[in-house]
Amino acid sequence: MRPPNKEIPRILAFFTAFTLFGSTLALLPAPPAHAYVSSLGNLISSSVTGDTLTLTVDNGAEPSDDLLIVQAVQNGILKVDYRPNSITPSAKTPMLDPNKTWSAVGATINTTANPMTITTSNMKIEITKNPVRMTVKKADGTTLFWEPSGGGVFSDGVRFLHATGDNMYGIRSFNAFDSGGDLLRNSSNHAAHAGEQGDSGGPLIWSTAGYGLLVDSDGGYPYTDSTTGQMEFYYGGTPPEGRRYAKQNVEYYIMLGTPKEIMTDVGEITGKPPMLPKWSLGFMNFEWDTNQTEFTNNVDTYRAKNIPIDAYAFDYDWKKYGETNYGEFAWNTTNFPSASTTSLKSTMDAKGIKMIGITKPRIVTKDASANVTTQGTDATNGGYFYPGHNEYQDYFIPVTVRSIDPYNANERAWFWNHSTDALNKGIVGWWNDETDKVSSGGALYWFGNFTTGHMSQTMYEGGRAYTSGAQRVWQTARTFYPGAQRYATTLWSGDIGIQYNKGERINWAAGMQEQRAVMLSSVNNGQVKWGMDTGGFNQQDGTTNNPNPDLYARWMQFSALTPVFRVHGNNHQQRQPWYFGSTAEEASKEAIQLRYSLIPYMYAYERSAYENGNGLVRPLMQAYPTDAAVKNYTDAWMFGDWLLAAPVVDKQQTSKDIYLPSGSWIDYARGNAITGGQTIRYSVNPDTLTDMPLFIKKGAIIPTQKVQDYVGQASVTSVDVDVFPDTTQSSFTYYDDDGASYNYESGTYFKQNMTAQDNGSGSLSFTLGAKSGSYTPALQSYIVKLHGSAGTSVTNNSAAMTSYASLEALKAAAGEGWATGKDIYGDVTYVKVTAGTASSKSIAVTGVAAVSATTSQYEAEDASLSGNSVAAKASINTNHTGYTGTGFVDGLGNDGAGVTFYPKVKTGGDYNVSLRYANASGTAKSVSIFVNGKRVKSTSLANLANWDTWSTQSETLPLTAGVNVVTYKYYSDAGDTGNVNIDNITVPFAPIIGKYEAESAELSGGSSLNTNHWYYSGTAFVDGLSAVGAQVKYNVNVPSAGSYQVALRYANGSAATKTLSTYINGAKLGQTSFTSPGTNWNVWQDNVQTVTLNAGANTIAFKYDAADSGNINVDRLLLSTSAAGTPVSEQNLLDNPGFERDTSQTNNWIEWHPGTQAVAFGVDSGSTTNPPESPWSGDKRAYFFAAGAYQQSIHQTISVPVNNVKYKFEAWVRMKNTTPTTARAEIQNYGGSAIYANISNSGVWKYISVSDIMVTNGQIDVGFYVDSPGGTTLHIDDVRVTKQ
């Protein structure tokens, strides 16, 4: 049944609001002189004009009959205007596009029948005559929703019914303090409003059943009920925001179609977003509390580390806020001296940095001395203050301020005119903060729903006119109401908490996980350009606690797969990647690099948003509206039409369940093919933090480019196009323009349509349409990578193309051609085609060639080049001969210079990676190899005949499944000598030893993760194999069918042999026995058996069957074609060497301090200081500290596997603050004299090592000791003891 009558409480609310808000009701109507009927009566007459049906409806004793005007404005959009008592219609609210005009539809309107009908190609509207009621149907007659006899349109809104199984969306999102979570709005009574702090909402209700409803209203009260099928909207009384545009008539739109079509319709009605500048697809660093020196140093560090960044945003630090008259609009030249002229702008333009400045809808009216300001006087005289908002003291500095009124066109002009100097001196983006409400001290004032829109209108119209359309406007604000998108504004989710989820650290702010629903519901409300404070903003202590490295890295990966990629923290906080340790830094950098490689792909969706209202991110229920599994799914989304993103968002996550809709999918990072329509268990490595689950939809066409430091750094002359043909034709439109101006609106753009299809039997087709638009980009050619088959013949418009021996030869060729090869996805045909031709090209690939490649080659000139400074970076050169590709890398004579490759592999394990190098320095040289943020080893590179001579050096490296970060670096701490040239690396497709951690396996029947014993591999082991049915199942991948050795690492401290059953691909292989070495559960050993596996994916499971005895602990599994030695990742003999284990569990480190002294040792992430004192690698590190005098040590004694051989000790340490009496690493009880390695007070992480430790007594004791007068801080991380 319907909810209780809403008219009475709404009217009461109206008059209550009148008392509370007084003058804020200037935009509200006077109460009507006559009452309105509660529902429509019978038809009196009808008339038809073109696509419009006008109905005169009896309203009883009221003067002037009601008017109902129904117009088919598009084939799938119906506009309805109800005018009770035939009143004069109110002006449209700013929600609707004021410039929108509708073309003739050619609807068929029949008024003779009962019901009357309006028919288009997409819809059939039936309207009964007695009483007048509407039913909305598809063109085929399928009923979608209808007005019940007791409902329908009336003076306060609309009342419809729909089938109770329909899923509803829109209406609302969530603010920064909500728990959030749901996308469904099947039963909702939440108000339609812009809300506060990251919220979005509006009078929009739509369904995946194929329809939507949009009411022209400034706020209001939607109501849906899943039990009754009610879909209603009430204008009601004044909302809490107070201010409101008046609506006497009821004007609404009905939209029919798919979710994508409905969102297009919303854009048609409320306005499409203009294209944002291309640079805004890049990475942005927002910061509170900075100055020119720090800003410049940070920018230079980004550039030195080759971490791409396009924009830097400043909080009030950039302004002379409260210091001078009109200081709100002026650069603070104390903080930014070069901004007194255009010098800072010129410097940052040269570095590729766009500067963004914060603005707020308020001005200073009295300075700190209570002197009235000029701008305050001007605003008073001009009538620019927001009605109902009084003066109050700002929380930022002790000055008196008052809200200005962007609803007022004169105020908008005034505000913009005073912003031009900032623009001239470098501010090209606007951070429009606090357009939702004032909350400062005792002051609490709400802004109206359209404040964000009008504030954005100020800067958009002003900036566009001021630059004559030559410079696109970019803005962000923290609320959204439909219509605001017309003014080039994005939405960010407000001051969210620095935590994984709400309640993890603080219970009054949302965390990272909640942002998924916030983003997706905002997209469902029509705001497709959304971002967040990556890393979080709020913390319990206000400004001190920072994200821990795991949280930071996972948040960066999440944010890289959203429309707007930005970091921000609270006052004094840093959010640059290098503050969070090497593991998090490298994972974050890889995420940024991935995004920058996808710029051509993403920019196509920037154009799409302008053309049809659908942007880069769409919820899965929009893309798959009939799939019940995704109706409320927030754990993944479409990133463009061809990529599904499902980032890791749980703390120290080891596996992730991901639902993939129907169809075929390919793992972007690992290359595995996956059948959709199921939930998969995705293994996650919490050690490396490199996993970014991203899946390619079969049929995908994905353009990518070489990563640049910033968008537009260099001309893009070649674009790679990865194509994954499906049996049905797929398409993608490549798009480009100048990226900066609005000339695209008049046809100055570049478009080229691409299609692809798998025709079977190795036959692939790819078409490149003729280019359209008048813009000519620098692009010269596409390298089309047709995955799935290596052809024997390729034609272009039926003419044979030239074949080349390799991809490198093809790239170097002057003209078009083709080659074959293999990559992580399998066999591939490469085709080089000229871009931008006036006629189309039809590429046909036939035949199936055998590809024998067993490795992938990664060129150094395509790698990430870094250094300790911009001047000392590794660099590309061509001044020698014999290199592969287009160049090689030199500059490794500078300490800190490095070359970082991003190889992809299907499975984790040990790989023989070969480095191609040149060294004619006269002696062997060395560089360190880092893998996923951790140093693995130094490699010695022999001297060669000359610099034109190249050789290879292979090293066994531990890689993780998916993308890896492999860096060759001159690292003087480790004794490297550098000064070599690097050409490429080759990485095998298959490992020497495949390694699968138990914590990432599929667990069932009671098996679970634990960390309460020592020396396990990875981050946990599996126990709970203590009851029938308990199982651990490893998902493995092998390159070919055959026999493999399986080594399962286990612990059995029961002092008796135990058994489990082994299953291969679901079939029982037999019972496996696990012997026991005694009662020590910290002793691990391998059970080895030979199994037969299929090529590709397999499962290996160990299960407690009825005949088994179970009760063992299980660790990692190794897979190899021959006997596996000790993997590189297991060569460190220490327990808990990086201090990552939860401190609630025991470990082999023994802490000592004098009995009369408090302990001065602990383990944490270093996140409680500004800047954070993060670990060297991983998520935690150990520390020594006490304010007073202290002695402290930790030690670990281990048994060595081989006696009378040499061992090596390594560690990373950082000492700061007071220099101690003694600080050292200690090595003792190994059969020789104690060895002490002193630690220097450098304030930065330093690598220390001791080699050639001859162990003769079967054990070794290593540790650290500090004797301090007080105030010394020592950080310790990644401690190692390995056999030399």
From Swiss-Prot:
Compartments where located: Secreted
EC number(s) per entry: 2.4.1.24
Regulation of protein activity: Strongly activated and stabilized by various divalent cations. Strongly inhibited by Cu(2+), Hg(2+) and EDTA, and moderately inhibited by Tris.
Enzyme class: transferase
GO terms for biological process, alphabetical: carbohydrate metabolic process
Temperature-related properties: Optimum temperature is 45 degrees Celsius.
Active site (catalytic residues): D433, D436, D495
Domain of life according to the entry: Bacteria
pH dependence: Optimum pH is 6.0. Stable in the pH range 5.5 to 10.
PANTHER family reported in the protein's UniProt record: HYDROLASE, PUTATIVE (AFU_ORTHOLOGUE AFUA_1G03140)-RELATED, MALTASE-GLUCOAMYLASE
This protein's name: 1,6-alpha-glucosyltransferase
Organism: Sporosarcina globispora
